[in-house]
Amino acid sequence: MESYNSQSINIDDVEPSVNLGGFAFIMLAAFLGALTAALFLPNWQPSLTQSVSGADPKAFWYLSRGSAFSAYFLLWLSMLLGTGITNKLSVLWPGLPPTIELHQFTSIIGLAFGLFHGMILMGDHYINFSLAQVLLPFATSGYKPVAVGLGQVGFYTMLIITISFYMRKKIGPKTWRSIHFVSFLTYILVLIHGLLAGTDTSAIGAQLFYLITGGLLFFMILYRILVSRANAREKKMKLQAIPPKPPTS
């Protein structure tokens, strides 16, 4: 990761903590790793997949559930760090430079877990997704197609947001910031996906997990809005306090 020596940082000048090649490698590794496991692991190590639940292997389902919670948590953490950057709370702790880098890094790793979460389901005998059904939103017809589709759309919007960071100099900071606001929609889509498609949603632990993370993020977003409005009012008052220049003859 790149280090910064000053808390006074222009966000528009920050370089990616992971270069484009590294980002592509991480995503490719998640894609190929899940694809290989889903397609070839049952033939290579049948005892491994059957050991979880006997004759009807659910190892892939458990892997998908675990990676789903990991992807959601990393997306949530990235959002939380992002709100801390904009409302300046990160200056207090852990500091603006590490917060910016963690914000970027958690987004990328969260995307990788999200990709793995979908791809590994190709090995599950109950859902039996094809590659096209995993990659194309709302292409499934068996298991909760709407809820699954919302998660797929959330993944692609997060992917677009992440890629836009690498194209920021080409598209301009204004366009990039507009795209970045889609991250709030992304979180909502992923949260709904988890609540409706997750088999653990009825568990108290999962409900508390979603409630605490969602509530904390909502508080941070609300705080960000209030701080932005207060700063705008303060700036307006300062401009109004400046005496007008005398007319020149």
Predicted regions and their residues:
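Membrane-embedded alpha-helical bundles that constitute the cytochrome b-like, heme-associated redox core
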Residues: 1-249
